[in-house]
């Protein structure tokens, strides 16, 4: 099974994968942890979108079809898990281009943050999997505040894809911890 103690891995970093519903506080928690543990690096799944030309036809209806999880695993997550430096180029959807290379030194804590961070393609490169959730009403409130006028499109497109991914791969059920942030305010 996946049971493993930190003491069993003295030469490798702790890799904490934070997945969960949009608006549940994944990025906020990752940022808080990074501040609390300066000897850490944070990898964002949002840095690994596929350029539109590389996406499969009908990607809008297929969970995770807009993500380059192979590249995330091979260029960033696996080296970080092995205690090696990481170098990768994030893809910016806003700019429609890859950004300059990011270089991250090996650290004892690696925070993998974002939707799809518990995807089966990434299994084996994490130590601890945490799923964040919140009540639907709270998710709506948070997303409206975050997305503003883009909320309707966001809710119609991304929320169903995410929920499909959770159901298909039993993401909450296979997490080591499930954290409900409904009462957490802005976490």
Question: Residues of each region from the PLM?
Answer:
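Hydrophobic positions on the alpha1 helix immediately C-terminal to the Walker A/P-loop
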Residues: 29
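Conserved nucleotide-sensing/catalytic segment adjacent to the nucleotide-binding pocket
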Residues: 54-96, 109
């Amino acid at each position: 099974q996946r049971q493993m103690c930190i003491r069993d891995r003295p030469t490798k970093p702790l890799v904490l994968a934070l997945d969960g519903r949009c608006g549940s506080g994944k990025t906020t928690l990752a940022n808080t942890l990074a501040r609390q543990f300066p000897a850490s690096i944070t990898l964002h799944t949002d840095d690994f979108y596929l350029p539109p030309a590389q996406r499969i036809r009908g990607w809008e209806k297929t969970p995770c079809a807009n993500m380059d999880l192979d590249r995330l695993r091979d260029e960033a997550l696996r080296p970080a898990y092995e205690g090696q430096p990481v170098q990768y180029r994030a893809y910016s959807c806003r700019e429609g281009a890859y950004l300059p290379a990011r270089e991250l030194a090996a650290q004892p804590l690696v925070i993998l943050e974002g939707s799809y961070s518990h995807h089966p393609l990434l299994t084996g490169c994490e130590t601890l999997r945490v799923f964040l959730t919140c009540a639907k009403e709270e998710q709506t409130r948070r997303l409206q505040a975050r997305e503003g006028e883009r909320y309707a499109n966001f809710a119609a497109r991304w929320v169903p894809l995410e929920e499909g991914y959770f159901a298909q791969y039993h993401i909450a059920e296979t997490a080591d911890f499930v954290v409900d942030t409904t009462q957490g305010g802005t976490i």
